[in-house]
Amino acid sequence: MADRGYSFSLTTFSPSGKLVQIEYALAAVAAGAPSVGIKASNGVVLATEKKQKSILYDEQSVHKIEPITKHIGMVYSGMGPDYRVLVRRARKLAQQYFLVYQEPIPTGQLVQRVASVMQEYTQSGGVRPFGVSLLIAGWDEDRPYLFQSDPSGAYFAWKATAMGKSYVNGKTFLEKRYNEDLELEDAIHTAILTLKESFEGQMTEENIEVGICNEAGFRRLSPAEVKDYLAAIA
């Protein structure tokens, strides 16, 4: 109750030491569709739920898993429009790095720069925090990377994690299933099974998306490939 008078101010701390708008942004993430990231020994998997609002909706018109460079990809939980802004910013940051250094941006560098953009929106007047958390997968220096970045601008490296609705169940499932010797194929199955833990209804190739990142680069799996993986775990 003591924080109520501070809930609309982004740049003022409440008496309990919180920026309440960031708490609300994290609530938007926790209410969003589940997303999962798993780092395998030879790559990274991103998977997310993508339920359609209507049977008339063209499911290929908007993707939740997006490539940023040839070797980095991203997914979100939370507010889609905010995510699209960050995708554009991330691509621009990657291009600027390439123009200066004439080499692809390392995954860690991109994560740091995107997180800095998100952090700026927690201490500026006239704006609000981004209502998304990001999972960023990459491959450089001959090894895979997986990071999560939150609305506060905090970022962490993960072996495997889940976010969005029912993220606690997802993380609990991953803690039981994950091991560091996991290979990419097994990681894809594990990611889909993690989504299935909290999935309501029939899971099909049309209502989930999967992306993989390995030494060949980052790509989204086609619906036909996702269908094959779903058949394998049925």
Curated annotation (Swiss-Prot):
What's a Pfam family this protein contains?
Proteasome_A_N
Q: Which InterPro entries match?
A: Ntn_hydrolases_N, Proteasome_alpha, Proteasome_alpha-type, Proteasome_asu_N, Proteasome_sua/b
Cellular location of this protein? Cytoplasm; Nucleus
Phosphotyrosine modifications at: Y121
Q: Which family does it belong to?
A: Belongs to the peptidase T1A family.
Q: Which residues carry this modification: N-acetylalanine?
A: A2
**What's a GO cellular component annotated to this UniProt protein?**
proteasome core complex
Q: Which PANTHER family match?
A: PROTEASOME SUBUNIT ALPHA/BETA
What's the protein name? Proteasome subunit alpha type-2
- Gene Ontology terms describing biological process: ubiquitin-dependent protein catabolic process
Q: What's the subunit arrangement here?
A: The 26S proteasome consists of a 20S proteasome core and two 19S regulatory subunits. The 20S proteasome core is composed of 28 subunits that are arranged in four stacked rings, resulting in a barrel-shaped structure. The two end rings are each formed by seven alpha subunits, and the two central rings are each formed by seven beta subunits. The catalytic chamber with the active sites is on the inside of the barrel.
Listed A to Z, the keywords are: Acetylation, Cytoplasm, Nucleus, Phosphoprotein, Proteasome
**Function noted in UniProt:** The proteasome is a multicatalytic proteinase complex which is characterized by its ability to cleave peptides with Arg, Phe, Tyr, Leu, and Glu adjacent to the leaving group at neutral or slightly basic pH. The proteasome has an ATP-dependent proteolytic activity. PSMA2 may have a potential regulatory effect on another component(s) of the proteasome complex through tyrosine phosphorylation.
Concerning CDD domains, the annotation shows: proteasome_alpha_type_2
